[in-house]
Amino acid sequence: MIKTTIWRQVVIAALLAGGSFTVAANPPPPPPVSYGVEEDVFHPVRARQGMVASVDALATRVGVDILRQGGNAVDAAVAVGYALAVTHPQAGNIGGGGFMMLRTKDGKTTAIDFREMAPEQATRDMFLDDQGNPDSKKSLTSHLASGTPGSVAGFSLALEKYGTMPLNKVIRPAIKLAEEGFIVNDALADDLKTYGSEVIPQHENSKAIFWKNGEPLKKGDRLVQKNLGKSLELIAEHGPDAFYKGAIADQIADEMKKHGGLITKADLAGYKAVERTPVSGEYRGYEVYSMPPPSSGGIHIVQILNILENFDMQKYGFGSADAMQVMAEAEKHAYADRSEYLGDPDFVNVPWQALTSKAYAKAIAAEIDVNKAKPSSQIRPGKLAPYESNQTTHFSVVDKDGNAVAVTYTLNTTFGTGIVAGNSGILLNNQMDDFSAKPGVPNAYGLVGGDANAVEPKKRPLSSMSPTIVVKDGKTWLVTGSPGGSRIITTVLQMVVNTIDFGMNVAEATNAPRFHHQWLPDELRVEKGFSPDTLKLLEAKGQKVALKEAMGSTQSIMVGPDGMLYGASDPRSPDDLTAGY
């Protein structure tokens, strides 16, 4: 174990110093994906002028309507983001944060980081109990769990710099949905009963919104959010200052002060969304752009793709034991590196160029045995941890001019803390749990972190969110992303591999069964749908196969050679919708 750790550190150091490794030549790139229909089992939604894919049908229609009115992809994305804060309160939000990947019609690709920040009064050991162990109640359900929200700042930055419509126009549909209400769908009803019951009933402000006659709202009930509508109206009228310096800031700060939270008006006034350079890589002739730190997603998607490029994935075939073995082993190495090197780049030096280098990937590829799995303990030791659920949301937008936007944002766990700030109607995040409360001990998603992701004032916690844009021959080819905690990275990875290596259209790639390995716990998690024979072969190779529930909820758009848009929403989310015109 020590030798393996030293080997990885030596390789990283060598790459930072300009070293190299000699390996075999790469396999030839696969043929381009087919856009035919006769031979396909799953068929994507088609449109020519613009398209939106999101987890909620109402929000998707809001975005398409903005596109029809002449708005661009950024205008539509901001409208969808605010709409989801109303219609998908499990994760859609203005009290949380996230990331946006954006590619303009002129070919500029950029990343907007609106991840939450730790308050000024945050301390490294704030989530430890008297025995020095992490206290999940503090980091998940208390007022201490909330970081300074970033969604409003992120949407405003994107709209001001890259949009064409005013804020008071794109936010108007969300205000209407909040004030007039909408019919609760299956997904919201189920999540209120399953997850909401754990956090919402303890808080009267929250219970007054989402409960009726002592029970969570059911499918078919109307959810009206008058106070949230008033908050959105303030943002429409006064811009982000309403949230960060005005009446909404007062509500959040007062809520925190009354209940032992840390966010102050100074924290809110000092929050800034940041535009960053995306992580980029080349995979079999395609350019892949994804989020840089404090998201770990982009680095590790590119890292794993670089490793896979040393194997003939097309020859192995989708769902084969060899393909799954190689991908699982590559994922182990990437997640081990995540725990060691990743954090907020404004606070720690993240060696992302070394981690995403072809040479480093080839060195790892040389360690992968197609016929024998390497135990995670031989990559780096750590503790076992529980499985996680889908508790984030993603949406994708492409407009008639070729502008493309991918957004993943969240409250962290479903409904966040369950706390509504005063009379604002705004649910608050529990994103502070994404910090490493104690190095080497897993968070709610089973992810192990180190000192690079320790709690510090004004720091942004590490994330797995991975909004991703793939480019072919200089043009946007795939816009994708997913919720799913630690499985976000591997879900997005499989969308890329399924389309590029296995020639699937976007609907086929979305419907295909998924699998996941995150190094710790040392198990290969698989959805239903893989052949029992394949799973037996994987076990014979040394994989510890565990059948799990559905993974991820991708919302993706593929652009054909002629500009035709092909979209697909994930069947794992029953109320999502892809639509265009």
Predicted regions and their residues:
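Internal maturation/activation junctions in enzymes
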Residues: 30, 311-411, 423-424, 439-440, ...
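Bacterial N-terminal signal peptides
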Residues: 9-20
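Active-site Gly/Thr loop motif
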Residues: 263-284, 358-387, 428-467
